[in-house]
Structure formats: C-alpha cells, structure tokens
A protein has these predicted regions:
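Alpha/beta-hydrolase-fold enzymes
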Residues: 1-33, 39, 165-169, 187-293, ...
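Alpha/beta-hydrolase active-site loop
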Residues: 146-167
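Catalytic histidine neighborhood in serine/cysteine hydrolases
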Residues: 295, 345, 349-384
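Short beta-strand/loop motif that positions the catalytic acidic residue
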Residues: 322, 328-330, 334
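Conserved alpha/beta-hydrolase "acid-adjacent" motif
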Residues: 335-341
Length: 444
C-alpha cells in the first residue's frame, strides 16, 4: 500500500496541469508577452541540466567555496584517505576545556553547518567559546571501492583520539548528523565495548536514526530489485551522488523537482542564488560496498538495534551499552529521518538523554540560528514512552534550539582555558596543511 501511495503521489505531481505549457495560464501569458523567449531560455536551461546530469535549483556561479560559503576561518590539520580534519580559529580569549568534534553526513558536504556567517552553526559554536573541529569526508572514487562501515567507525574513533591528543584533554563532545549520527551511535557502542567510553563526554544526534522500522518513504527503495539496480549503477566501486540527489528530490517532488521545471524550464526565470540549494546540489559519491550494506543491513533488515547482529571489526555492536549523555534532535516535518523514527533512539541508549523536537525538517530544523528568530522547538522533561506522549506534554519555545543545546553542553563541563597554544589551528603538534574548507570538499 505504501508503495502504491508513493507512486500515485509522484504520478499526480508529475501530471499536474501546471507542469505543461498549454495548461498553465501563467506560462501561456508569459509566452505571449515574450514571444516565446521564455521557452527558448527554458530549453537552454534544460539542455545545460541534461549535460550536467542534474536538475539545477540555484545559480551555481554565485558561490565560491571559502569566500561566501564554507568561509569560517580554520585550518586542515590532518588528512587521511577518507577524511580531512578541520580545526577552527577561536574568536574568544577563553574557550571551554572540552572541545567539540562534529561528524557531518558523507552523503552531503559538511558545509551545511557553515553556509554563511548568519546561518553557520560552526561559526556560532566558535563564538560561544567552543573549540570546534569538523570532519570533511572525501567524496568516493574508485580507490574507495572497498570502504565499508567499519572504516567510517574507525575514522570517527581516530578523529576523537586525534583531538584528545592534540589538546591534551580527557574527552570531547561529539555531534553526528544523519548517517554520521547513526555511525556515532555505533562508535559509542564500540568504545563502550572496549572500555573506552570515557573518551566522549557527550553525544549529540542531529536527525539520526538507529531503529529503521519506521524510517519513512526511503524504506520503499530497499527491496531486492532496487538494491540490484543500485549495484548496477555502482560498477566503478562508487555510486554517483547525482543518483542519491534525485532520490531525495523525489521524496518532495512538487517542491524539489516540478517547481523548477515550471519556473525555469517553462517560465524561463533566472535561477536565484540560494546557499542552501547550492549545497543541496553539491553531491558526493558514495562507496558502493558501504552503501549496499547500509541499505541492506540497516534500512531493510534493521540489524543495528539487535545486540551483536553487527560488528565493527571483531567488536560486536550493542547500543544498550552506551551510557554517554545524549542530546537528540529531531525535525517535526523531516521527510528523510521522520521524527518518530529518530525518537526510537531513546529506547536503545542507557545514559541520560534529552530529546528536542524542532520545527521544520531535515535541514532547516537543524540550521536555525537564534538571530533568525524562526520556527520553534518543543521540550518535555517528563519521562515518555512514545513521541506522541512527548508532544502531548511538551512545552513549545519560540525560536532556535541552539541555546538549549549550549546550556546542555555546559552542564557536561563548563571549565575554560586560554585560547592559545594548540587551541590555535596549526600551533600545536599538528601543523596546518591548508586553509579551511580544505580540498576534499571541493573534489567532485
């Protein structure tokens, strides 16, 4: 039924009269006004998109990496075949002793958290006095054909160890966004199994799932036929990121596909510059082996929540061993990681937890700076078994949840140190390799 409903919705959206020039009054009017120039321009846009192999959503020439997007000052201080580690310049005289290591999803580019100075979570965190590090994952190529989930777990453990050693601290705060949050849960389970849980002071999960039993429309794309097709598309050892972009766009076809068909192909309108849509179209390739196992083992078979069903190397993964304090954020309108699916992490972690339901979805629900005064979030300090119970007793607070997170972080260590020595990128034992945002984020 779900597949029929999804297919029907897609068909109805595609066949909307607004999507055809002779049944859209606005297109007809503009065609008469311009003598058909709008259709000529639209055809040119369409041909350019066909050549690129991707539907455009914004003016791609309006942004330059490190200049007006991903521009928070910092240095790449470590590079491996899988990731670069970026350390950001402090802007305060004192910083919190416990640093923050952010793991963004490798399905997209890390700078979703550093779009511009007004929207940047990274810049905001630095301004709060947090020593901030982020991992920039390499977009997959043929050399990464054998990369599997174990490698990403090992990379997270390595990044945590690197920052601890660099700054001489006992532990770090961590953030995992989407698939990197799922991986962070596995990483914490591995550390717990190895009696190394003390390396992480806290874990924050942005729209991250561990139980995929109610993972939304993406569950419709993991049957044997779909997996076989994805395998065929990954013949060079990686999946071209444009396929993933098309998949995510199809989940909201009206907004992310047909809206641009009408405005740009039919109306001939110019593409407006929009940093979020630039990021959305800046795709990354995925290692084929990792992608196949991720869809099969997590989405289809839901193995992660069964203790011992999955391993990282020889270490069994058991989420119930995780005692690390956790801050769990979900988006009320998230169509990629539905809030009810994210909620399920509450049943598997055993340490203290705080759940926050943010207004909006998978991106805007996360990237919501306080200065914007947009949306809202809900909190509920009473114990709840279900998301419905949480919502029923929740308190709505206008604006961004970032301040709530900051207060929570301070509750897990508020001692400060001078922002000098190794707290300055390149001034510790790890020298600067290049300026942020680094070269990996620019690789296609």
């Amino acid at each position: 039924k779900a597949k029929i409903r999804f297919a029907t919705r897609g068909l109805v959206e595609a066949l909307s009269p607004a999507n055809f020039p002779f049944t859209n009054p606005q297109v007809l009017e503009k065609t008469l006004e311009t003598g058909g120039d709008n259709l000529v321009r639209g055809l040119q846009f369409m041909l350019e998109d066909i050549e690129r192999g991707q539907l455009r959503q914004t003016d791609t020439d309006a942004f330059e990496m490190g200049v007006n997007i991903a521009a928070t000052p910092g240095k790449v201080i470590k590079e491996t075949p899988l990731y670069q580690l970026i350390q950001y310049e402090p802007t305060t005289k004192k910083v919190f002793e416990t640093p923050l290591v952010i793991f963004p999803p490798w399905i997209n580019r890390f700078y979703i958290l550093d779009l511009n100075p007004q929207k940047s979570f990274i810049r905001w965190a630095v301004e709060q006095g947090i020593s901030t590090f982020i991992v920039s994952w390499k977009s997959a190529d043929a050399s990464m054909a054998d990369v599997v989930w174990d490698d990403y777990i090992a990379a997270q453990i390595d990044a945590i160890a690197t920052v601890r050693d660099l700054l001489g601290v006992e532990n770090v705060h961590t953030i995992g966004y989407c698939v990197a949050g799922t991986t962070l849960a596995a990483t914490l389970a591995v550390l717990a199994a190895q009696d190394a849980a003390q390396c992480v002071a806290s874990a924050t999960f942005f729209t991250a799932q561990v139980d995929f039993s109610e993972a939304g429309d993406l569950l419709l794309m993991v049957d044997d036929r779909q997996l076989a097709m994805i395998e065929q598309l990954s013949g060079d050892g990686f999946l071209d990121g444009r396929y993933m972009a098309a998949t995510f766009n199809s989940l909201r076809g009206r907004d992310l596909i047909w809206n641009y068909v009408v405005n740009n192909y039919l109306m001939g309108d110019d593409y407006p510059p929009f940093d979020l849509l630039y990021w959305n179209g800046d795709t990354t390739n995925l290692p084929a082996k990792w992608h196949q196992s991720y869809l099969r083992d997590l989405y289809r078979d839901n193995k992660l929540v069964v203790p011992g069903q999955m391993h990282a190397g020889s270490t069994p993964i058991d989420l119930t061993r995780i005692q690390t304090p956790a801050y769990i954020q979900a988006g009320r309108e998230d169509h990629i990681a539905p809030a009810n699916s994210v909620w399920k992490i509450m049943h598997h972690l055993r340490g203290p937890k705080r759940f926050v339901l943010a207004g909006s979805g998978h991106i805007a629900g996360v990237v919501n700076p306080p200065a914007a005064q947009k949306y809202q979030y809900w909190v509920n300090d009473a114990p709840c078994d279900t998301l419905d119970q949480f919502v029923a007793g929740a308190r709505e607070i206008k604006g961004s949840w970032w301040g709530d997170w900051l207060d929570w972080i301070k509750g897990h260590g508020d001692s400060t140190v001078a922002a000098k020595g190794a707290r300055i990128p390149g001034k510790g034992k790890l020298k600067a390799i290049e300026d942020a945002p680094g070269r990996y984020v620019k690789m296609r």
